């Protein structure tokens, strides 16, 4: 290799120039090809949305040179840059394949534990991603053979790197600067509210640019405090002098069980949808005995915490600039005024129950400030665990809730977020919709069993189920 490294070709400044100039273009192409899985579609997008590809290439160029000035050697800067964007390409491909949702900046805030994310994925071999990896590796080897170095002392290199990073950061995060950038390059910076609106934006931007737009959206979702806002003002608006006080001794405090059922939807409302007979029979039986209606949630295909936030605070995320992860807007180490907090003040024992990892979305850290006496995740379950596919089933969670109510003195408030019917829905012997609807049927059956057991309990209990 040393002989090859010293050859006229790899020692030529012209060769160095060509490899350095083409690197961002090459990485841009490999990144988009990996997630698009079609050379013809990539070429068509390049010709029809040329400005987008130019912006993506310039962004890669900025990151490439930002790293280069820090590490001095171009092949190391190239390796770091290529690894970053190849990882983005793989994440986008597999995430969209499994969930139908695109990779966004907010996804990076979902978990501090990468192992949590792998539980959602059923990875399969992809020849084009493997080919891209080999081509990228070959290019990095060529950069190593060129051995391009920035011959400047670190203070100078560090200063230049800082300038590149600073200019790039403010260009992406400051709305007044990002808006004209979008105009120049034809970027679709439409605000995305869910997977459907993001799909339309992604078609116009592709992976790299859409990810950059999601960075700007994350920053601009910051909420500003209204003028003259104060706790006293809110309390004065809520006070009702005409309401007669109720004697505490006359109040019956039933257990409150709040169930947020994973990925539940009534597919009978979709035109042309062939739903197997009996799928929702148990749900219909439950509705005959209960008050029921339709619920509208602020998310689809991901970001469960958006719905959780609305149900815990009674506050629509739309009022918070549709923040992707609304609890990220809250100040740290401050007790939050949630429904759990309200019930706790009324003498309830409060529990949050979610049979998944405590680190996902940072729930354990954040929800400890929501007024819950106890947080229970998958490692905290004390009843025998059963699973549907890869996740703890609803029956296990309901029996855990029953155990909590039996062991505590006084009334309980339990917020349950289930996991049973979470994606992926892939199966060798059924369609994704078929697998999903089988999970729905099981969810309905196990909810009815839970309600029937509660009817036999001596403790009065109200169940609110978001289905």
Locations of regions flagged by a protein language model:
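Membrane-proximal soluble helical/coiled-coil segments
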Residues: 119-122, 128-129, 240, 246, ...
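Membrane-interface micro-motifs in multi-pass membrane enzymes
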Residues: 99, 105-106, 195-208, 298-302, ...
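Transmembrane and membrane-interface helices of multi-pass
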Residues: 2-201
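Alpha-helix initiation and N-capping motif
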Residues: 108-111, 204-208, 231, 280, ...
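Short alpha-helical interface patches
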Residues: 99, 106-116, 128-130, 210-218, ...
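Membrane-interface segments at or immediately adjacent to transmembrane helices
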Residues: 175-258
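Solvent-exposed soluble domains appended to multi-pass membrane proteins
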Residues: 241-254, 260-261, 266-467
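Short, well-ordered coil↔helix boundary/capping segments
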Residues: 81, 104-108, 205-210, 395, ...
């Amino acid at each position: 290799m040393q002989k090859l490294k010293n050859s006229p070709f790899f020692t030529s400044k012209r060769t160095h120039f060509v490899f350095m100039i083409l690197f961002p273009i090459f990485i841009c192409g490999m990144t988009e090809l990996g997630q698009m899985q079609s050379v013809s579609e990539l070429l068509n997008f390049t010709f029809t949305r040329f400005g987008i590809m130019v912006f993506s290439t310039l962004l890669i160029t900025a990151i490439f040179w930002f790293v280069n000035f820090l590490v001095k050697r171009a092949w190391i800067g190239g390796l770091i840059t290529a690894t970053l964007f190849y990882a983005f390409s793989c994440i986008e491909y597999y995430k969209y394949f499994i969930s139908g949702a695109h990779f966004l900046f907010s996804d990076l805030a979902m978990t501090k534990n990468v192992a949590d994310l792998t539980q959602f994925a059923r990875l399969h071999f992809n020849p084009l991603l493997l080919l891209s990896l080999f081509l990228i590796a070959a290019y990095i080897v060529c950069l190593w053979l060129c051995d391009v170095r920035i011959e400047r002392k670190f203070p100078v290199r560090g200063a230049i790197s800082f300038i590149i990073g600073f200019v790039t950061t403010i260009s992406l995060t400051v709305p007044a600067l990002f808006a004209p950038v979008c105009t120049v390059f034809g970027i679709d910076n439409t605000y995305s509210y869910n997977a459907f609106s993001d799909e339309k934006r992604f078609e116009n931007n592709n992976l790299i640019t859409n990810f950059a737009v999601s960075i700007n959206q994350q920053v601009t979702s910051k909420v500003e405090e209204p003028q003259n806002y104060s706790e006293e003002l809110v309390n004065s608006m809520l006070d009702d002098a005409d309401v007669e006080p109720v004697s505490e001794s006359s109040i019956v405090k039933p257990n409150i069980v709040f169930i947020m059922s994973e990925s539940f939807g009534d597919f009978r409302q979709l035109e042309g949808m062939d739903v197997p007979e009996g799928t929702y029979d148990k749900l219909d039986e439950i509705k005959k005995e209960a008050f029921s209606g339709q619920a509208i949630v602020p998310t689809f295909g991901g970001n469960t915490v958006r719905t959780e936030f609305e149900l815990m605070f009674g506050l629509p995320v739309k009022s918070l600039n549709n923040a992707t992860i609304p609890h990220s807007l809250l100040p740290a180490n401050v007790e939050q005024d949630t429904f759990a907090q309200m019930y706790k003040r009324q003498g309830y024992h409060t529990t949050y129950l979610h049979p998944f990892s405590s680190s996902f979305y940072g729930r354990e850290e954040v929800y400890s400030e929501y007024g819950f006496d106890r947080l229970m995740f998958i490692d905290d379950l004390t009843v025998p665990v059963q699973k549907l596919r890869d996740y703890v089933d609803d029956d296990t969670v309901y029996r855990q809730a029953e155990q909590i109510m039996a062991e505590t003195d006084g009334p309980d408030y339990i917020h349950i977020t289930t996991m049973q019917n979470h994606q992926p829905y892939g199966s060798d012997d059924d369609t994704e919709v078929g697998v999903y609807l089988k999970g729905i049927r099981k969810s309905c059956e196990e909810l009815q069993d839970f309600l029937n057991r509660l009817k036999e309990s001596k403790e009065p209990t109200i169940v609110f189920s978001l289905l």
